[in-house]
Amino acid sequence: MTVVCKLGSSIVAAPDGSLREDVLDLVCAQVASLHGGGERVILVTSGAIARGMRLMGMEARPAAIDELQAASAVGQGDLFRSYESRLGADEVRAAQVLLTASDLQIRDHWLNARSTLTRLLDWRVTPVVNENDTTATDEITFGDNDFLAAQVAIMMEARLLVLLTDIAGLHTADPRQDSSAELISEVSDATEIADLEIGDGTSPFGLGGMRSKVAAAGMAGASGIETVICDGTAEGSLRDAVAGESVGTRFTA
């Protein structure tokens, strides 16, 4: 079975746009370990725009679509190489896969994307998926790839979707603003969290917040796929999520 793991901009890029090398080291080491244990892992990454902005010396996220697209074009290759080199050090081959919303809406495109991803997994290659921001339009505001990750999980009939962020999971309030916020370890029914004020806080470079992650978990759950939202900066969090250990917030399906 397949596991889809999504890394948000907040754990890929630091506030100044530099790559969070330590976090990428941590996550890629876990992916390599899972790969060695027979898991089929697909990575979905954000961060191309953030990386491009850093390389181009931009301090603020551009508002113009063409500038966002150009920044993504500058950053995407460098971002992929960051994954490729780390996975390659553990003898795991990586492949870059860029998708747009239309690839997941047009039947022929969807079938081709699924066939390609399936072949890569059969070859024991780890796909590194990102949205093709250079040709996308409205998709650039598509929730920091949370929905893309959910759709890839559905397409590949994954057993688990893991959304890695920079906080421990879904809380009763924003833990960065409320010290009394408590971690919600499991959600089995969306009505359980209907009354929560789920924030849209993001990194300076991303667009996805906890709200989009919860929505992505709901989308995956409707197709029978469990989702775990957890802290990607914590040692072993991805490994524990895949093993079914208590980590972050698990949305049962």
Positions of PLM-derived features:
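C-terminal catalytic "cap/lid" subdomain
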Residues: 1-253
